[in-house]
Amino acid sequence: MRRIFVGDIHGCREPLERLIGELRFEVGHDELYPVGDLVAKGPDSLGVLSLLADLHANPVIGNHDLAWLRADRIESKSLARWLRQSPVVREFEDLIVVHAGIHPQWSDRRLAQLAASDIAFATNVRYCDEHGVRPHSDWPVPDPPFLPWDKFYRLRRRVVFGHWARRGFDRSDRVIALDSGCVYGGALTAWIAEEDRVVQVPAMAPPRS
């Protein structure tokens, strides 16, 4: 079984279909884990949800997903129910999956019992200080003591996340950042954990020769 993690899709069904093809994804053999923000901004949010549901994907919830659910913007009630079941954090023995980031003061036990007040941090953070206080704005880049949240991350498991298109794809011993700005004309990125391999497709399909 391969665990395949996918960056922010934002309603871009066509690049998602190409990525699935590049991955040679097989339902029942592979497992797909989108890192949230499946909807909004792109041209076919409903199509993205439908495709992911058909593939039995296991997303975490993103800030735009939450906004659409709260505003009742998803026309299909069954797809809305499917999306609403997505957790804020998904845990594996070796990995933590979250849309935006992990608070510096959260423990492994806290991750298993997140409060409603924790959801905003997990789905929105980019910068914070060592206490988890966020700046008023993430742009322009805030001055110290505010740093990228993972500078203060101390748990042992690697974190897979999205949310941060300006940061783009980034990989270190502690994190895998997967939002490569597909909806802005960048790329859609997947990371295959068992192979430690990255697969990307451009936002726009290359012209046919």
Placement of each model-derived feature along the sequence:
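Divalent metal-coordination and catalytic microenvironments
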Residues: 8, 37, 52, 62-63, ...
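Beta-strand-turn-beta hairpins that frame and shape the catalytic cleft
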Residues: 1-4, 90-96, 172
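Active-site-proximal loop/helix segment associated with metal-binding centers of metalloenzymes
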Residues: 81-87, 92-152
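Conserved beta-sheet core of the metallophosphoesterase superfamily
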Residues: 106, 112, 146-204
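Catalytic-core regions built around general acid/base machinery
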Residues: 48-55, 78, 82-85, 149
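Core catalytic region of metal-dependent phosphoesterases/phosphodiesterases
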Residues: 2, 6, 11-74
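Active-site environment of divalent metal-dependent phosphoester hydrolases
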Residues: 10-14, 40-43, 66-69, 90, ...
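Short hydrophobic-aromatic micro-motifs
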Residues: 5, 59-60, 95-102, 159-161, ...
